Amino acid sequence: MSTRCITPFYKKLEVVNGVTTGYVPFPCGKCPPCLRRRVSGWSFRLVKHGEQTKSALFVTLTYNEEKVPKTKSGLQTLVKADLQKFFKRLRKLTNEKISYYAVGEYGDKSERPHYHIILFNVNHGIVEAAWRIDSVDIGHVHFGDVCDASIGYTLKYISKEKRIPTFNGDDRAKEFSVMSKGLGANYLNERTIKWHKRQIEERCYLPLKDGKKASMPRYYKDKLYKDGEKFRISVHMQKVSEEWADNLIQSIGEDNFNGKLAERHINEFRRMAKKSKQRQKL
């Protein structure tokens, strides 16, 4: 499935000497392929980050009936401060450097607020102790293994349709994500930096273990490349995109190309809408 942005915006770029180079497309960040690219980038960063830590846990935090927060109108709601205080208590209970990627969301059926966390460098006992106040449980703690499935489950928030508010007077807090700074920074070392810089235009991607390639997140691009190098990459990607389109037009004709492109765009958004409806029915 393609990760090429289907609704890009264009910027007019100029070379240092003032010569206008034309317009170069930039990803919109909102279409289905862009969202898939974000998920892929975060998945890579979390896997890489886990390679340098002592432990990794997939944690779900829920509220007891008497502890669940409620809005002024009586609706059960997420409270970001509860999660932040949880991390603060965690840090007090250990000398290890804790890092995390966390989301707050509502259950598809019950709409109860809960939190999913990919949590590094803590053990089960400390997590359970931190989800208590004055030795009283705030709710239940569920543990799972950190794997492709649990990372994907946590990251589904990125491509999930934002549902709050769902009706007039819905005063619940919106679903959210929070994360530690520098997740996956360990990927960039002397060897990998040299590899990427050796062929700047051709190696602006992440090599995966199965030989496939993943789009490079902006986090790595900003650390790897200077503005001039980013410009070279943008021009190169535009050229590759134009060559791909020209070859396809020569193969199937311009009318068929435009028809297939429009059909692809429509199907991408249909798939995204269908997934959203399926989540609401679960």
Model-predicted segments: where are they?
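Signature for HUH/AEP ssDNA processing cores
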Residues: 38-109
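Intrinsic-disorder/low-complexity loop/linker signature
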Residues: 17-19, 51, 62, 73-74, ...
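A broad, low-specificity signal marking well-ordered, structured residues that form hydrophobic/aromatic
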Residues: 29, 57, 100, 141, ...
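Conserved His + Asp/Glu catalytic blocks
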Residues: 97, 107-113, 117-244
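Hydrophobic side chains in beta-strands
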Residues: 33, 61, 104, 117-119
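Generic structural motif
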Residues: 36-37, 64-66, 122, 146
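DNA replication initiation on ssDNA origins
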Residues: 1-47, 246, 250-256
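C-terminal non-catalytic accessory extensions
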Residues: 238-282
